[in-house]
Regions:
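N-terminal assembly/interaction segments in proteins that build large macromolecular machines
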Residues: 1-179
Length: 179
């Protein structure tokens, strides 16, 4: 099982502060140890804020750290994944976090493969995992944007090239369909 949490501060200066980063790591550990699954809606965050933490709750600690650091801190979202092997990848000094899990293998090769996938996801920042996850409305919107851009091109692209551009636009929104 792995967990990733987004705790926001008002400035990058605070986000690089050892007190802040230690706090985020500790809250992440508390979230991981809890029965919560994660999310970004109000109920999930409220449940996380109620989790026991260092003799109080996560909410109490958040208020205390806000006072200590002198900047408003907030928990925006968190996610947990479970599998035979789970890895996390943090990039950009904590600005990007990815967690990936898989079942069926738990050896070093599986861990390395998942780490590589997590790094790729962090680099691509896909909106979807697969084209199958893209709603019909979003697909239509992507097609419309691509067609409009192509039609405004003075070269007036032939239909086969236009279709390839549409495919490329959709693939760039989904991680597993990348070439």
């Amino acid at each position: 099982t792995a967990c990733v949490i987004e705790v926001n501060s008002e400035t990058d200066f605070v986000a690089k502060n050892e007190t802040f980063t230690s706090f985020v790591e500790a809250v992440n550990a508390a979230a991981l140890a809890s029965d919560l699954q994660g999310g970004k809606d109000g109920e999930d965050i409220e449940a996380l804020l109620a989790v026991p933490f260092e003799g109080a709750t996560v909410k109490d600690a958040l208020v205390e750290k806000t006072a200590t650091i002198g900047e408003k801190l907030s928990i925006r979202r968190f996610e947990k994944v479970a599998g035979d092997v789970a890895v996390s990848y943090i990039h950009g000094g904590g600005r990007i976090g990815v967690i990936v899990a898989a079942n069926g293998a738990s050896d070093d090769a599986a861990r390395e493969a998942l780490t590589n996938i997590a790094m790729q996801v962090a680099a691509m920042n896909p909106t979807y995992i697969s084209r199958n996850d893209i709603s019909a409305e979003e697909l239509a919107k992507l097609q419309e944007i691509t067609v409009d851009a192509a039609l405004n091109d003075p070269a007036s692209l032939p239909k086969p090239i236009l279709n390839k551009l549409i495919d490329k636009a959709m693939n760039s929104s989904a991680w597993s369909d990348e070439d």
